[in-house]
Structures are given as structure tokens and as C-alpha cells.
Amino acid sequence: MSKDSKMRATINQKLTEMGERERLKELLRAKLTECGWRDQLKALCKDVIKEKGLEHATVEDLVVEITPKGRVLVPDSVKRELLQRIRAFLAQHAT
């Protein structure tokens, strides 16, 4: 396991143990709904299903096609806020 992987695992473990991971997920859900991201993704999914046809569109097709677009559509302000919260948590709980 690389040094980066170990650090990520340690950070993830600390976030999970302290309950911060769930709080961050809830914040992310709320922010993405608030900015219309979820509605944009629903519309993209509907477009893919129309294009492929209901009988031929699979969940895997949707995941493959929508995931990269979904990541790009996350507003920078949401990414910054989440990163800021993670950094603040880590600074507060540094060992």
C-alpha cells in the first residue's frame, strides 16, 4: 500500500469513527439538491434512456455515461466547501 493510500485510509477511518463522514455526506446531498445538480442528472438519465430505448438502457449504461458528466457538473463552490470542512475537521483532530 502506498503512502498516499495509507493516509487516505487513515483519514477515512477517522472521518467514519467520529461520524463526520455521514455529516459530510448529508451536507453534500443537501448542497447538490439545492443547486439543482440532482435535477440535472435526472434529466441526463432520461435523455440516455430515450436515446437507447427503455428496453435497452441498463443501469450500467447510465452509470458509465452519467458519472463523468455528474462529476463535472458539481459546482466548484460545493467542492470547495466540502474540502474546507474536511480540512477543518483534520486540523481539529490531528494526532
From Swiss-Prot:
One GO-annotated biological process of the protein: positive regulation of DNA-templated transcription
Entry GO MF terms: transcription coactivator activity
Cellular compartment(s): Nucleus, Nucleoplasm
Any Pfam family the entry gives: EnY2
Gene Ontology CC, one term: nuclear pore
Domain of life of the native organism: Eukaryota
Keyword list, A-Z: Activator, Chromatin regulator, mRNA transport, Nucleus, Protein transport, Transcription, Transcription regulation, Translocation, Transport
UniProt keyword annotation of Membrane present: no
Family annotation (HAMAP family): ENY2_Sus1
Similarity comment: Belongs to the ENY2 family.
Subunit structure: Component of the nuclear pore complex (NPC)-associated TREX-2 complex (transcription and export complex 2). Component of the SAGA transcription coactivator-HAT complex. Within the SAGA complex, participates in a subcomplex of SAGA called the DUB module (deubiquitination module).
PANTHER family: ENHANCER OF YELLOW 2 TRANSCRIPTION FACTOR (PTHR12514)
Role this protein plays: Involved in mRNA export coupled transcription activation by association with both the TREX-2 and the SAGA complexes. The transcription regulatory histone acetylation (HAT) complex SAGA is a multiprotein complex that activates transcription by remodeling chromatin and mediating histone acetylation and deubiquitination. Within the SAGA complex, participates in a subcomplex that specifically deubiquitinates histones. The SAGA complex is recruited to specific gene promoters by activators, where it is required for transcription.
UniProt-recorded name of the protein: Transcription and mRNA export factor ENY2-1
Taxonomic lineage from the root: Eukaryota, Metazoa, Chordata, Craniata, Vertebrata
